[in-house]
């Protein structure tokens, strides 16, 4: 393009041998070598000036950042790579081409290797090998690894109040690079929930038991007040059938979920009150259609299918009020049925977004986390290809963004114009892209049939890659269009994840 490429073409000092030759071997009679040189000397500056003017006119249409990128790419790319200014390609097509990257590591040929655990998933969107022995250096390993370049992983589903190393800050101090716990703030959460494990939408059964609630509590030395809460409820004349080792009054040799189906309430009492520590006690109650009465996670509402689907004893002072509520619901069928309405109408989008996370096995999510980290490190290196990430034509600038569904590895391109860097435009661009691909969400085959929808994609959230699931699902939100615009302009080729519901 323009001035530099044209200056590389003609040579300034032409020799006698380079002049046109007539058939008889003499030079053209119309001009001598000296007159030709004079003509070249006369017209060459004019030609150069014209080309410079044209070039400046083109470059002035770019903003400053685009000017730097254009000049950088000019010196590293052939003229065929810079046709966007000539109108041969649209900005989107040009960006798709010049922003493309061939990374130094092809995971299809050189898969992620995780050491210290057997592979426990069928498929994953990034090639990944797990095992105990290999000639290859691991990308990550369970336990504290002292091998340089290998990430150390801790994985546990136990409460941090019983196992201090599961505390996120403690794990970091010990040297773990990747934390996998029940905490949604961990790098790769490993929760007790999933569509595959629990038939959450199972129909409600008749409540035939005389007792209001059932309890299955065997650890009578829990580090919270659950045993005291059980005793206090019994003293309020709430009849409870206890199948566990604590205050047992019923034969414990029953199938738990089947037994719970016939009680109006289930005591989902955890052994600790810890954020995000929500175990099978709660989810089995949902399966059974027995309203869970919770002692446990202070943020239990984030794990509930609807706001009125549970009762929460946050502290001992709440016992009397909860007991009163249980009796009221038991005596008022319409009010009680409201607590189970989600079974018929479907749970909230936030609940579906949470459970959908488990549609991708935690080990696969670990592999994606490691692969993403490897790519990010390469992109930060000085040797990494510089990409324009935006294109300006006239007064309009087009920005190149990348997006993937949560649980996938590969990215898809979307584009936004500078006059429309809005949250609405971002969502529309994401939907348009994935709908054009006839994309099927990860959870499609995992959810119960009644929750798979009508085939139309709906966005629950879009967030920058790198956030924890706590941030992505509950805490993060762009503060209006200006916040999104600033993020896009400050982060060339920004990457996002989308959660579909």
Curated annotation (Swiss-Prot):
The record marks 218-219, 226, 243 as: May be important for donor substrate binding. Glycosylation may be important for enzymatic activity. GO terms for biological process: cell wall organization; L-fucose catabolic process; protein glycosylation; protein N-linked glycosylation. The C-terminus (388-501) is important for catalytic activity or for enzyme stability. The N-terminus (1-89) appears to be dispensable for enzymatic activity. It comes from Arabidopsis thaliana. This is Glycoprotein 3-alpha-L-fucosyltransferase A. Its EC number is 2.4.1.214. Its cofactor is Mg(2+); Mn(2+). Residues 61-501 are lumenal. It is found in: Golgi apparatus, Golgi stack membrane. InterPro entries: Glyco_tran_10_C, Glyco_trans_10, GT10-like_C_sf. Its main location: Golgi. It holds the Pfam family Glyco_transf_10. The keyword Transmembrane applies. One of its GO terms (molecular function) is alpha-(1->3)-fucosyltransferase activity. Gene3D superfamilies: Glycosyl transferase family 10, C-terminal domain.
């Amino acid at each position: 393009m323009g001035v530099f490429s044209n200056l590389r073409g003609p040579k300034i000092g032409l020799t006698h041998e380079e002049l046109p030759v007539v058939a008889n071997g003499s030079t053209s009679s119309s001009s001598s070598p000296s007159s030709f040189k004079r003509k070249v000397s006369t017209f060459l500056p004019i030609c150069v000036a014209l080309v410079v003017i044209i070039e400046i006119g083109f470059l002035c249409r770019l903003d400053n950042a685009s000017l730097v990128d254009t000049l950088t790419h000019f010196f590293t790319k052939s003229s065929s790579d810079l046709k966007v200014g000539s109108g041969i390609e649209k900005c989107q097509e040009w960006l798709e081409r010049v922003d493309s990257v061939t990374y130094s590591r092809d995971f299809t040929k050189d898969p992620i290797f995780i050491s210290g655990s057997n592979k426990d998933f069928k498929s994953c969107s990034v090639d990944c090998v797990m095992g105990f022995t290999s000639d290859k250096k691991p990308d990550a390993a369970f336990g504290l690894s002292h091998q340089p370049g290998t990430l150390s992983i801790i994985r546990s589903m136990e409460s941090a109040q019983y196992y201090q190393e599961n505390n996120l800050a403690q794990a970091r101090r010990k040297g773990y690079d990747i934390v996998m716990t029940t905490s949604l703030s961990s790098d790769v959460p490993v929760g007790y929930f999933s569509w595959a494990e629990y038939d959450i939408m199972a129909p409600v059964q008749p409540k035939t038991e005389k007792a209001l609630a059932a309890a299955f509590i065997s650890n009578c030395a829990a580090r919270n007040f659950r045993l005291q809460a059980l005793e206090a409820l019994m003293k309020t004349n709430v009849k409870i059938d206890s199948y566990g080792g604590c205050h047992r009054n019923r034969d414990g040799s029953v199938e738990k979920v089947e037994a719970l189906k016939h009680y109006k309430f289930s005591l989902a009492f955890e052994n600790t009150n810890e954020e995000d520590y929500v175990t099978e006690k709660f989810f089995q109650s949902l399966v059974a259609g027995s309203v869970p009465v919770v002692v446990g996670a202070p943020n239990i509402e984030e794990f509930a299918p609807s706001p009125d689907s549970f009762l929460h004893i946050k502290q001992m002072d709440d016992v009397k009020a909860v007991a009163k509520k249980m009796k009221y619901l038991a005596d008022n069928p319409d009010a009680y049925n409201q607590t189970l309405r989600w079974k018929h109408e479907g749970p909230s989008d936030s609940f579906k977004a949470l459970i959908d996370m488990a549609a991708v096995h935690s080990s696969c999510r670990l592999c994606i986390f490691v692969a993403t980290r490897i790519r990010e490190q390469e992109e930060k290196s000085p040797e990494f290809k510089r990409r324009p990430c935006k294109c300006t034509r006239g007064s309009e600038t087009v920005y190149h963004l990348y997006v993937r569904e949560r649980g996938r590895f590969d990215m898809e391109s979307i584009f936004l114009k500078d006059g429309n860097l809005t949250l609405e435009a971002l969502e529309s661009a994401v939907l348009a892209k994935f709908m054009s691909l006839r994309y099927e969400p990860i959870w499609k085959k995992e959810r119960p049939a009644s929750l798979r929808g009508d085939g139309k994609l709906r966005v629950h959230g879009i967030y920058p890659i790198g956030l924890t699931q706590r941030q992505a699902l509950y805490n993060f939100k762009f503060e209006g269009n200006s916040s999104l615009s600033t993020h896009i302009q400050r982060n060339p080729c920004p990457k996002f994840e989308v959660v579909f519901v």
